Amino acid sequence: MNPLVAATSVIAAGLAVGLAAIGPGIGQGTAAGYAVEGIARQPEAEGKIRGALLLSFAFMESLTIYGLVVALALLFANPFVS
């Protein structure tokens, strides 16, 4: 295995996980803030807001999991290694 390919794969795996976590992290923080604001304005709609919030958290977190899958593929099933 070429050491340059191995080193680049490790760096790319770290970047994949790190960059894949930035967007969902910001999105989850923003969504949680607006959910708290919405519950404060309409306490009777708490159940609907919480359900929509948890569903959106699941979709946002799936993006981070995709980044993790790409990182694991680069580390353990690297297509660039012959």
UniProtKB/Swiss-Prot annotation:
Its main location: plastid. InterPro entries: ATP_synth_csu_bac/chlpt, ATP_synth_F0_csu, ATP_synth_F0_csu_DDCD_BS, ATP_synth_F0_csu_sf, ATPase_proteolipid_c-like_dom, F/V-ATP_Csub_sf. GO terms for cellular component: chloroplast thylakoid membrane; proton-transporting ATP synthase complex; proton-transporting two-sector ATPase complex, proton-transporting domain. It comes from the Eukaryota. The record marks 61 as: Reversibly protonated during proton transport. The keyword 4Fe-4S does not apply. It is found in: Plastid, Chloroplast thylakoid membrane. The chain crosses the membrane at residues 3-23, 57-77. Keywords: ATP synthesis, CF(0), Chloroplast, Hydrogen ion transport, Ion transport, Lipid-binding, Membrane, Plastid, Thylakoid, Transmembrane, Transmembrane helix, Transport. It is a multi-pass membrane protein. One of its GO terms (molecular function) is lipid binding. Belongs to the ATPase C chain family. HAMAP family: ATP_synth_c_bact (MF_01396). In plastids the F-type ATPase is also known as CF(1)CF(0). F-type ATPases have 2 components, F(1) - the catalytic core - and F(0) - the membrane proton channel. F(1) has five subunits: alpha(3), beta(3), gamma(1), delta(1), epsilon(1). F(0) has four main subunits: a(1), b(1), b'(1) and c(10-14). The alpha and beta chains form an alternating ring which encloses part of the gamma chain. F(1) is attached to F(0) by a central stalk formed by the gamma and epsilon chains, while a peripheral stalk is formed by the delta, b and b' chains. F(1)F(0) ATP synthase produces ATP from ADP in the presence of a proton or sodium gradient. F-type ATPases consist of two structural domains, F(1) containing the extramembraneous catalytic core and F(0) containing the membrane proton channel, linked together by a central stalk and a peripheral stalk. During catalysis, ATP synthesis in the catalytic domain of F(1) is coupled via a rotary mechanism of the central stalk subunits to proton translocation. Key component of the F(0) channel; it plays a direct role in translocation across the membrane. A homomeric c-ring of between 10-14 subunits forms the central stalk rotor element with the F(1) delta and epsilon subunits. This is ATP synthase subunit c, chloroplastic. The lineage of its organism: Eukaryota, Viridiplantae, Chlorophyta, core chlorophytes, Chlorophyceae. The gene is atpH.
